[in-house]
């Protein structure tokens, strides 16, 4: 999931 991955990178 790209969206979930972005939230984790934040």
Swiss-Prot record:
The superkingdom listed in its UniProt entry is Eukaryota
Q: What is this protein called?
A: Unknown protein 4 from 2D-page
What organism does the record attribute this protein to? Bombyx mori (Silk moth)
């Amino acid at each position: 999931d790209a969206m979930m991955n972005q939230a984790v990178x934040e």
